[in-house]
Amino acid sequence: MTDPNNKTKRSMRSRIIVLILAVILAGGGWWTWKEGRPLFYGVQAYIYGFPMMMDLTRETATTVPTAGQFGAPVNQFAVMTEYPDASFRAVVRTGLDTLFAVAWADLDEEPLVLSVPDTDGRYYVIALFDMWTNIFASIGSRTTGTEAGHFMVAGPNWQGTPPPDVKQVYRSPSRFVWVNGQMRADGPKDYDVVNPLQKQYKLTPLSAWGEQYTPPQEVPYTANPDTKIPPLERISNMDAGEYFGRLARLLKDNQPLPADGPMVDMLNELGIEVGKDFDISRIDPSSAKALRRAMVTFSILEKAVHVMPTKDGWAVMPSDIGDYGTDYVNRAGIAFVGLGAVQPIDVSYPVAFNDSEDEPFDGASRYVLRFDRDQLPPTKVIWSVSIYDPDGFYVPNSINRYNLSAWMPLKYNEDGSLDMYIQAESPGVDKESNWLPAPASGTFNLVTRIFWPDSSVLDNTWQMPGVKKVQ
């Protein structure tokens, strides 16, 4: 049987050719290969480096003196003690089934020991992302269980012996690591249970292990007004010198992976050398011109991630999330549409921009998503459907509801089926428990989250039903 995931990946990869041609033709006129090759390389360099721009998310999160809900100094956890509202802008398409505890680890000086509590069976997962957005380790219910434990995270060049009470050593290929933890919380009623568990997450420098370590307070930092701007908006506003200059700086501490050799050769030909500063005014003029032209890739990438292969309007995220290899297109696409997405075996993310007739969602219309009794998402934990505006943020509404989750008091039909009403106005008091408020106008998109999904989700034998427009 043909693997649908392979079809998805092939389709996304093939779009790089269309993408590059679109950039080349955008300026009009005919190009020779000599003229077009730098641009061909420039677009690929842009796509290759795009996930590394998650460094802007790091900047936003760590430019604070003390740990809070949405930010913390380096090597400390920011603990989300309650679900955010529609004003949240730090990360796109964030979920509302799990409370996050997130840290940015700097492994430049020494390894860190990550300590987790006994969650008494409560579901949690901590994904360790390198700066290329690959997940090099996953800690939690599925992989390591829910008992307390200590795990060491070491940088690529560390040599030494871990403490005897460390369960496992995870080696990061990059200096910086995004420690992205989430723990199931069924709304405010669970906060009193989950918050104390979250606050037991801890990162301890190896040199302080065995001591009574307290993370530093009131850490000095340099205020940066740009951190108030959503990271994707900051990227879209960059010029070529800033974008590729930042990439060159990041490559000093976060080396390309061994399989990236051909891409590194392309970067070198463009004048972007690993470990060296980059100044666009000092490179070959044809390369500089190509890199400036390549910046339009952002807007084309934005469109490309919305046209993944779908069934009944739903696109299933590629199966290589978190383990991309040289699949740079998928890697950039996921960084664009859902930075922080974990591996499908932990969470599956069907996404819909269109209804069952493949028409874009419109806030002026009304929709119904119906699950037959035997069609409910198969999961070992929890599932939900969330709604977002075109930029990937919550849709403000009168009841402050941004998702419908299986733990909520949803009303099922007599035959066991479930209807969700997706529209701007209330469907009526008797149906309001199943109402997912949409914007009054304009487009929106939906993300289903299936935590620890059944194998039928992973092999696509189970699929989401289409969202039908109400006539």
Model-derived features with residue positions:
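A compositional/structural signature for long, glycine/proline-rich flexible linkers
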Residues: S14-Q471
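N-terminal Lys/Arg-rich, disordered targeting/topogenic segments
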Residues: M1-S11
